[in-house]
């Protein structure tokens, strides 16, 4: 829906002088917009605007934003001293944690996460898993970590043979469902191929015989009408080996 609030993880982190916690708070775009409007209203001494904006900030639970941002940073591995350090003092991996904290802080109806555990240690991964389990919006998550996916996801979207297939359940359930689907499709494909072969042999044998031409023609039409079952598609395994020194 066009009115959904979408949150995502920025891939770039500028080397800023501002404290880490202030950078994370910038992730709440609506809060920052209202703060800017409040500053302008204060400069104009516009009481009506100030009251209105305070009401909107109250709705956003703005008065707890510092503690919420600090809680996110602590969960992602920052200590109390580090959350006050400038963004530019952190390495690339830790800056990505700041970007992740930004995305989690921003109120959203749709949260997009692409390999969010890449720069996290085990404690941070466990914390993030618990946080995402209680997330109230719609989460679109890409990850190669099945142990991370299983407790969180309830649907799997699988791209296969240029088609998008939906499976209900966690990743382990998806593997079982897909294996069952492939086995069924393989069995149906083989059964149909046997039927096609049987019909084709009959056609080849009797199409030139006057006494059997009608039956052969009927089988030809049956072949033409038949909706072909595709063979089960299995991804080619990727393998390589190091060259001997």
Residue ranges, per PLM feature:
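ABC ATP-binding cassette signature C-motif
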Residues: 1-190, 242-245
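Intracellular alpha-helical coupling/juxtamembrane segments of multi-pass membrane proteins
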Residues: 178-202, 206-233
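Amphipathic heptad-repeat alpha-helical coiled-coil/stalk segments that mediate oligomerization
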Residues: 230-245
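Short hinge/gating elements
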Residues: 55, 204-206, 238-240
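Generic low-polarity alpha-helical segments
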Residues: 108, 114, 228-229, 234
């Amino acid at each position: 829906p066009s009115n959904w609030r979408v949150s995502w993880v920025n891939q770039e982190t500028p080397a800023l002088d501002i404290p880490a916690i202030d950078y994370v708070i910038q992730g709440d775009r609506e809060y920052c917009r209202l703060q800017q409007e409040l500053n302008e209203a204060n400069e104009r001494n516009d009481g009506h605007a100030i009251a209105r904006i305070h009401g909107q900030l109250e709705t956003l639970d703005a008065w707890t934003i510092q503690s919420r941002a600090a809680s996110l940073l602590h969960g992602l591995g920052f200590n109390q001293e580090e959350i006050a350090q400038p963004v530019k003092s952190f390495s690339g991996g830790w800056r990505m944690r700041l970007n992740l904290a930004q995305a989690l802080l921003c109120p959203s109806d749709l949260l997009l996460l692409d390999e969010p555990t890449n720069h996290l240690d085990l404690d941070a991964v466990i914390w993030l898993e618990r946080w995402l389990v209680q997330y109230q919006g719609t989460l679109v998550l890409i990850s190669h970590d099945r142990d991370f996916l299983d407790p969180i996801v309830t649907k799997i979207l699988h791209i296969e043979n240029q088609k998008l297939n939906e499976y209900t359940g966690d990743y382990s359930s998806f593997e079982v469902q897909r294996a069952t689907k492939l086995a069924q499709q393989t069995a149906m494909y083989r059964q149909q191929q046997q039927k096609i072969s049987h019909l084709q042999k009959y056609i080849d044998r009797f199409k030139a015989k006057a006494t059997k031409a009608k039956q052969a023609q009927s089988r030809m039409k049956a072949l033409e009408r038949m909706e072909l079952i595709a063979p089960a598609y299995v991804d080619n395994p990727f393998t390589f080996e190091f060259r001997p020194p």
